[in-house]
């Protein structure tokens, strides 16, 4: 997979806004969207923004990342991209997500779980940066990490920056279990050669596949 430029908050890592590490007992853990908001949305100001998200993309007060970015000063949110279940979570598991218009914002919604699962050049032509904000669960069969990988591929091909708004892995970072996918069995629920429980946040996972070039076509 062609490498992509992933914007950073920490100078030490190549991903945007991993959750803030709690330095003292009881310190609040902040999801990436809150870190971005505290920075004044600086890396998005003046850019045309696309957003891959679903109902799990919220702040600690359950405000949707869609609504936060849509109303953010200086940010021009121009398109939404719907993974499995859609951006508002109104499609059943495995159901086809269609291109539509978001009722709350009037923004176009491009389906990433219908006729195609990888954004087409046409879907990306009006954006300067792609933001990804979905809560991961830490297991390989979660289709959203496959969507993330395909979004990264498509954006790399078009020279579009990707911002991953990170969130904690609910299974933690110390538990890694399960076998790798065997050759011939890669699919949208097993797209990468990683253990079933892989012990990374979605931001760390994005960095990992970016640096390792892991896409299912290149794995032997």
Language model region names:
Residues 8-18:
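Bacterial N-terminal signal peptides
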Residues 28-75:
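N-terminal phosphate-binding or glycine-rich loops at protein starts, especially the Walker A/P-loop
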Residues 89-93, 163-186:
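Glycine-rich, charge-decorated loop segments at or immediately adjacent to ligand/cofactor-binding or catalytic sites
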